[in-house]
A protein has these predicted regions:
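Active-site rim segments in enzyme catalytic domains, especially the processed small/beta chain
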Residues: 123-127, 136-140, 146-148, 292-293, ...
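M16/insulysin-pitrilysin zinc metalloprotease superfamily fold
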Residues: 326-342, 497-506, 512-535
Length: 549
């Protein structure tokens, strides 16, 4: 309700009572209208004031309705939003974000919260990520002012170097998982709570079950035939005593995965890489036609890396280096920095068209540079920094009057495979620390291989390597050929943006395959309040997609 202001109503009443009657301002003509007696004037004045009170009451009522409607509209638009003054967890699984916040309430670090949240997302959005996949952390330590990257993406097994990959699913598509090693290294360096404690919420969730969410339900429907045809997948994702997939809000359980998580929680990461879980991984992947060995698991290491950092409009962007999508994201923002975009840049249809044309062209040129980027032979970012330094010269190549349908016009020399789905998580802790992490099993449900012993769904990351034989217009990128221990190129771009005082201004990333880079670029531009729409352009499809926000 809106409280009436007596003073305002009194003022309105006085103005009405002191006003001359309407007829007093018109010259009276006795032949037209006879003069009124004083009682009639009083009656007329009373009726006029009565009408004004009614009008005021109606206007106030309308104002109340409008206010209520506006408030309801605000809540409808942001029904899933949660606002926090000192800390926050943003994930694509609502119950998982709550787990992350609870971990921080228990005095857990931002990394503790990230690990606990990711374990949960591996259940809630089991089609996108899980312990059978890999990830990239970007971590900010506010006390030291340092940012680091932990790369635990999947690597090619030692027996895969001479194979030409022709499948995007099944055993041959499975790379060596790195998720758990990534958790372990991040926890070793930045954890505060006991390792075991981070697993408890997800173990409970896996055992007790939870309703199928919208994202998982859509993935199940989209892949209905493959799920229902697989005994191991149907064991979890189908209704009891039926081979029909679960629907949104149906209860889902992961009892075997709960046992696996308990073992990793109690024994540690070696249970996965050098223990009973590892034994089952090798056995099951082999039965599915894959090549992972015990030695592959034992030799796997997560890498601590130096991030790429670029300054854009006074902010510093930190992203992973190659072979992630970070260098392309940095290059895009440096190209666009020179245009000095502002709200004025999208104030009219004509200006908006020009602004988005420039953005799309920047996307194309930046993705072309990505295809020419060499595979890093060391953790030195020299080659990447050389690529980013081309921003000014690339901007000069962008024409405001035309585009080009010839892909060689943009300088692309080879094609990289399109990546599958992912899951992203952003965290800011009360102490100012931050985590941006993207995790994936690559395609939806990864390789479509699930162990009926451990409950692990395995990735299909081998599909992200370039094939030697390719029928595309351009040759495959040789720097992305499969080699033992190599990580494939990726669009994953978990980013952290700091201001000049080293305060976190944005923790950002995305899921959605190759659109990760362009979506993250536009969200980063939004930090500078430059645009209010998200625009995607996946070079080189030449079909931009626009989403208002």
């Amino acid at each position: 309700m809106v409280e009436e202001n007596p003073d305002e109503i009194n003022v309105l009443s006085e103005d009405v009572s002191n006003a001359k009657p309407l007829q007093s301002e018109i010259k009276q003509d006795d032949n037209i209208r006879p003069s009124r007696s004083e009682p009639e004037r009083i009656k007329t004045r009373f009726n006029f004031r009565k009408k004004m009170y009614c009008i005021i009451a109606v206007l106030l009522f309308i104002a109340v309705i409008i206010c209520i409607g506006a408030i309801l509209h605000l809540f409808q638009r942001c029904s899933a939003c949660v606002f926090h003054q000192n800390a926050g967890v943003a994930s694509d699984g609502e119950p998982c974000s709550k787990i992350g916040r609870e971990i921080m309430k228990w005095n857990g670090s931002s990394v503790d919260a990230a690990i606990a949240t990711l374990l949960c997302i591996g259940l809630v959005n089991a089609h996108s990520m899980g312990i059978g996949g890999g990830l990239i952390f970007t971590i900010y330590n506010a006390s030291t002012g340092q940012v680091e990257v932990i790369n635990s993406r999947e690597v090619a097994p030692e027996q895969e170097s001479t194979r030409s990959l022709e499948t995007v699913a099944g055993g041959p598509s499975i790379a060596v998982p790195g998720e758990i090693r990534g958790y372990a290294l991040a926890h070793q360096r930045h954890g505060r709570l006991p390792w075991k404690q981070l697993f408890e919420p997800s173990i409970w969730l896996a055992r007790k079950g939870f309703p199928v969410g919208k994202s998982l339900a859509i993935a199940l429907e989209t892949n209905k035939e493959q799920i229902e045809a697989s005994t191991s997948l149907c064991d979890v994702f189908c209704k009891k005593n039926s081979n029909k997939i679960l629907r949104e809000n149906d209860m889902i359980y992961f009892p075997k995965l709960a046992i696996t998580l308990r073992m990793i929680a109690d024994i540690g990461p070696n249970a996965f890489y050098d223990g009973p879980i590892g034994d089952d991984i090798v056995k099951y992947v082999s039965q599915s036609g894959g090549q992972i060995s015990l030695n592959d698991l034992k030799q796997y290491k997560a890498n601590k890396e130096t991030p790429i950092n670029v300054t854009v409009d006074g902010y510093t962007l930190y992203v992973p280096g190659a072979p992630s999508g970070g260098p392309v994201l940095a290059l895009i923002l440096k190209i666009l920095e020179g245009y000095n975009f502002s709200r004025e840049s999208v104030s009219t249809q004509e200006k908006k068209a020009l602004t988005y044309h420039r953005i799309i062209e920047a996307f194309k040129f930046a993705f072309a540079e990505r295809s020419n980027l060499e595979y890093p032979t060391s953790r030195d970012n020299t080659k990447v920094n050389e690529m980013i330094s081309k921003a000014s010269s690339i901007r000069k190549k962008i024409s405001d009057s035309h585009t080009n349908k010839r892909i060689d016009y943009y300088g692309i020399k080879c094609l990289l495979p399109g990546q599958g789905g992912t899951s992203h998580l952003s965290i800011v802790a009360p102490d100012g620390n931050a985590v941006s992490v993207t995790s994936t099993i690559n395609g939806r449900f990864g390789s479509f291989v699930r162990s009926n012993v451990t409950g692990i769904i395995f990735n299909n990351q081998m599909a992200d390597f370039s094939q030697h034989e390719d029928n595309n217009r351009l040759p495959p990128c040789s720097q992305n050929y499969v080699q033992p221990g190599r990580r494939p190129f990726s669009a994953m771009s978990p980013a952290i943006i700091l201001d000049k005082d080293k305060k976190v201004k944005m923790v950002v990333g995305a899921s959605g395959s190759s659109r990760i880079i362009t979506a993250t670029a536009l969200d980063s531009l939004a930090l500078m309040d430059r645009i209010k729409e998200r625009l995607y352009h996946v070079p080189f499809d030449f079909i931009p997609l626009l989403q208002s926000v």
